[in-house]
Amino acid sequence: MMQVKYFIGIASVCTALFLGACNGDGNSNSTQPQEQAKLQPIVIQGALPVESEKMAAQLDNATVEMIGEWKFWKGTYKGYPVVISKTRMGMSNSAAATALAIQHYKPIAIINQGTAGGHDPDLHVFDIVLGKYTTNIGTFKTPNKPVGGGSNALEWNEAFDVLPDDESDPEPIAIRKFEGDKELLLAAYKAKPNYTKGQVVEGTIGSADTWNNELDRIKQFHTVYGTSVEEMEAASVAQIAHQFEVPFLGIRILSNNITNNGAYDPATGEACQEYALDVAEQYMKAKAAAK
């Protein structure tokens, strides 16, 4: 019996030493989850279910939170804190969702992603545009015309800046472009090799509560504003993020492009979500390593 107790004691000591050694060997790696937990969450937005629910389904330990009519999923992805926001469609909805997310979750950064229509004939369905710039293409001053003078949208070529540096200026005529955050762009480039369904390019995302189907008008936006794609949320998100000084990047996938007969493909919504999650992971990984 004494021999049995002796051997049990020896085994217990060996086990303790072995586990201690394992913990010691993994010490450099054990700090990673701690650093991940210390990070503020990154918010990834999508306007519609087809642009948000795929991401939400991939979160671990997700909880759903409703603030007014805006839906948020809070959880982790690859160990990093992530909030998925369904902003709903349009400039006002996305601006409100962004302000709520910033106030409620204090995010480290915001990615606005989803589908878009092409303005650049060289881009095709499933190509992804990284918003080096994001701009509001729905703010402009029309020319003066008398009753009976008609209306021609191709003459609406004076952009109106709704966020002027000089608020005393009664007519701030300028194209306001919000620049994509450089660290988020770097993360997007790190994720680029994993995306194989199309190109990933930098460009300008144009936003407005308008669905443009006039090819001459689209060509004008592409020429004057330099737009690659159009959609209905990113510029308002960029504007709110800018005022709260939160890093921002717009990521848009071409779901259709009438400039080159690119037909709508509903699978683009999920493809962009997968890429956006990859970008978020790369960004959070870099932030954790920098701590």
Where are these regions (language model features)?
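Bacterial N-terminal signal peptides that target proteins for export
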Residues: 1-10
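C-terminal motif of bacterial Sec signal peptides marking the signal peptidase cleavage site
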Residues: 18-21
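Bacterial signal peptide processing site
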Residues: 23-25
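N-terminal short beta-loop-beta anion/metal-coordinating cradle
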Residues: 33-99
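Mid-sequence, gly/pro-rich, charge-dense loop/helix-turn segments that line enzyme active sites
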Residues: 120-218, 222
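A C-terminal functional module that forms or caps the active site or interfaces directly
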Residues: 208-250, 259
